[in-house]
Amino acid sequence: MIDMGGASVQIAFEMPKTEDFVSKDVFEINLGPDGSQNDFNYKIYSTTFLGYGANEGLKKYEASLVSRGESEDSCAPKGLSKTIGDVSVKARLFLKTLNFHRMKFQGSGQWDKCLTRLSSLIDDKTEPACSEQTCFLGYVPAPTFNLSTVQLYGFSEYWYTTSSFGAGGEYDFEKFTSEVRKFCGKDWVDIQVSRIRLFKMYFGFFF
């Protein structure tokens, strides 16, 4: 399973019995009736990524905009203006600066540019370099087997976000990307109108 909250991201999955990866994030549990049957023995990898939750991720992104001194926000809808200034200590350390001032930004709704910007924030330079062959996010030691062979279930923000774009259920990258790209190309005024219409429909359902 993978779970995204406001401050962190968690992941937990069963490792293959042939995987010999050793770490403080690996736990062995036995679900047998008396804990002695090997058929019920499971090796679980579980870790958390502090600072990669939805809220902290947004703060890091906004801090990067402020540090660059840019007025365009490619991740915000066209027509949306917002003021950014106060960011978390974690975000400031991530960007290696403590000097911030309030700035006003204008959304441009550019999906590809937004994706590039967000991807550049994944590598946390405040964490020590990882010495293992495989590492999550560049600094968390991880097993070497292909994670795409693991069936993962997304919770919290993963579910909320995909469901909001009609892409819930089994994850389909192409479908989800297509829906988000279309949404990002909309004007803020149109998004607000759609939200009001949806609220009225939802409210009318009960009355």
Language-model segment annotations:
Residues 1, 9-207:
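Helical "lid/coupling" subdomains associated with nucleotide-phosphate turnover
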